[in-house]
C-alpha cells in the first residue's frame, strides 16, 4: 500500500494553479481592501468621516468602479466579509462587478490576532474553527483566493521558537483547508517593522520565519503551486538610526527568499508594512531590478500604500470621487510598473512620501 495519498484531485490542483498564476501575471498585483470595520474607521477618522456601513460601501465602490484600466495592473482584490455582500448604488454586487472586469475577488478569512500564552507579548491568529464551511461558502459566492495574516515581532527575545512554530502551523492548516475548498491561500507571515533592529537582523529573522512556514506547509501537504506568499519586505526597524538604500533592502529581501522559498511557489506579493506610498513602490521596483536569481513573480499586495492618497483626495464627498479614483489609478499603474522593475521618477500623490506606519499594526 502506497504511503502517498493524493490530497487534491487533478481538476482542483489545475484550478488552484491557474488562479495563483493569474494573480501574479506580469505587471499585476493585489489591492488589499480587507480592512476590518475598526481599522477602516481609523482611516475615516483622519478625514472626519463617520464609520457607517454606507460610508464603507461608498468608499469600496469608489475603488472598484475606477476606470477599467485599473484591471491592467490589479489582478485581484482582497475583501472583508462585509464587502463580499455589498453592492454598487445601482445594485450590482461588488463580486460580480470585479469579475466582469477580469479581477479576481478574494477574502480575508482570519479572525484577528490573540495573545499566545507562554511568550513575551507574542500572538497567534484565530479563525480555524469552521474555516472549511466558510471557505466553501465564499467559493460559492464568487471568491477564488483567501488571505490569512500571522504576526511576528522582533525584540531581544522575539520571535520565540514557540511563536514561529505555532504561527507556521496555523498558516499551514489554513492553507490546506482553503485548497480543499477551491481557494488559493495567500500565506502571510508578517514580521512587524516595529523596533530599532538593523537590516541584517530583519533579514535573519525573516529567513527563520519563512523556514518554519515552508516546513509546516510541507508537513500539512499543501500544494505549493496553488499558493502565494505575502511577506514583509526586509527593511530595518522603524526606530533604527542607520540608513539603508533601496538596493540594500532589495538585496536583503531577495536573499531571504532565495534561502527559504521553494521554486514551486508561483509568486510573492509583498505587503507594504506601513511604508510610504513612494517607499513601497521604490522598494518593490528595486527588488525586481536586483540581479540575483528570482524564480518567482515578485509583485504587491498593498493596502495603505494603494489607498492613502485615494482616501485623502476623496474626503468622503461625492464630488471628490473622481479625484480619489485618479489617485488610486496612478498608484496601481506605478506599482504595476514596479512589479516589472520599470518604475521611474516620483509619485505625485496626496500621501506620496508620508509614512503610513502604525505601531503594532492590526487589521
Curated annotation (Swiss-Prot):
InterPro entries: Aldolase_I_AS, Aldolase_TIM, FBA_I. Keywords: Glycolysis, Lyase, Schiff base. GO terms for molecular function: fructose-bisphosphate aldolase activity. Pathway: Carbohydrate degradation; glycolysis; D-glyceraldehyde 3-phosphate and glycerone phosphate from D-glucose: step 4/4. It catalyses: beta-D-fructose 1,6-bisphosphate = D-glyceraldehyde 3-phosphate + dihydroxyacetone phosphate. Its EC number is 4.1.2.13. One of its GO terms (biological process) is glycolytic process. Substrate binds at residues 56, 147. Pfam families: Glycolytic. Disulfide bonds: none annotated. The active site is at 188 (proton acceptor), 230 (schiff-base intermediate with dihydroxyacetone-p). The record marks 363 as: Necessary for preference for fructose 1,6-bisphosphate over fructose 1-phosphate. Belongs to the class I fructose-bisphosphate aldolase family. This is Fructose-bisphosphate aldolase. It comes from Echinococcus multilocularis (Fox tapeworm). The gene is FBPA.
Amino acid at each position: 500500500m502506497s504511503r502517498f495519498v493524493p490530497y487534491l484531485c487533478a481538476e482542483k490542483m489545475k484550478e488552484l494553479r491557474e488562479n495563483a498564476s493569474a494573480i501574479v501575471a506580469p505587471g499585476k498585483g493585489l489591492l488589499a481592501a480587507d480592512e476590518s470595520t475598526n481599522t477602516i474607521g481609523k482611516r475615516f477618522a483622519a478625514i472626519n468621516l463617520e464609520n457607517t456601513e454606507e460610508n464603507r460601501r461608498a468608499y469600496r465602490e469608489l475603488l472598484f468602479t475606477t476606470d477599467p484600466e485599473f484591471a491592467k495592473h490589479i489582478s485581484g482584490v482582497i475583501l472583508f466579509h462585509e464587502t463580499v455582500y455589498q453592492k454598487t448604488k445601482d445594485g450590482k454586487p461588488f463580486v460580480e462587478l470585479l469579475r466582469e472586469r477580469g479581477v479576481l475577488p478574494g477574502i480575508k478569512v482570519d479572525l484577528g490576532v490573540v495573545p499566545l500564552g507562554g511568550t513575551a507579548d507574542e500572538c497567534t491568529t484565530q479563525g480555524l474553527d469552521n474555516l472549511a464551511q466558510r471557505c466553501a461558502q465564499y467559493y460559492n459566492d464568487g471568491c477564488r483566493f483567501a488571505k490569512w495574516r500571522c504576526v511576528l515581532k522582533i525584540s531581544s527575545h522575539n520571535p520565540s521558537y514557540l511563536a514561529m512554530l505555532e504561527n507556521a502551523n496555523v498558516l499551514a492548516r489554513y492553507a490546506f483547508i482553503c485548497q480543499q475548498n477551491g481557494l488559493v491561500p495567500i500565506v502571510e507571515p508578517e514580521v512587524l517593522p516595529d523596533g530599532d533592529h538593523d537590516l541584517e537582523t530583519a533579514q535573519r529573522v525573516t529567513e527563520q520565519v519563512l523556514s518554519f512556514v515552508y516546513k509546516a506547509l510541507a508537513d500539512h501537504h499543501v500544494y505549493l503551486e496553488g499558493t502565494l506568499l505575502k511577506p514583509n519586505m526586509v527593511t530595518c526597524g522603524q526606530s533604527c538610526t542607520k540608513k539603508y538604500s533601496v538596493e540594500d533592502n532589495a538585496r536583503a529581501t531577495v536573499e531571504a527568499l532565495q534561502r527559504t522559498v521553494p521554486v514551486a511557489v508561483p509568486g510573492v506579493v509583498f505587503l507594504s508594512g506601513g511604508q510610504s506610498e513612494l517607499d513601497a513602490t521604490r522598494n518593490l521596483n528595486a527588488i525586481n531590478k536586483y540581479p540575483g536569481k528570482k524564480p518567482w513573480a515578485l509583485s504587491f499586495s498593498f493596502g495603505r500604500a494603494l489607498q492613502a492618497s485615494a482616501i485623502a483626495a476623496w474626503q468622503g464627498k461625492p464630488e471628490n470621487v473622481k479625484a480619489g479614483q485618479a489617485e488610486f489609478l496612478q498608484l496601481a499603474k506605478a506599482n504595476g510598473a514596479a512589479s516589472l522593475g520599470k518604475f521611474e521618477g516620483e509619485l505625485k500623490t496626496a500621501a506620496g512620501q508620508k509614512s503610513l506606519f502604525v505601531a503594532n499594526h492590526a487589521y
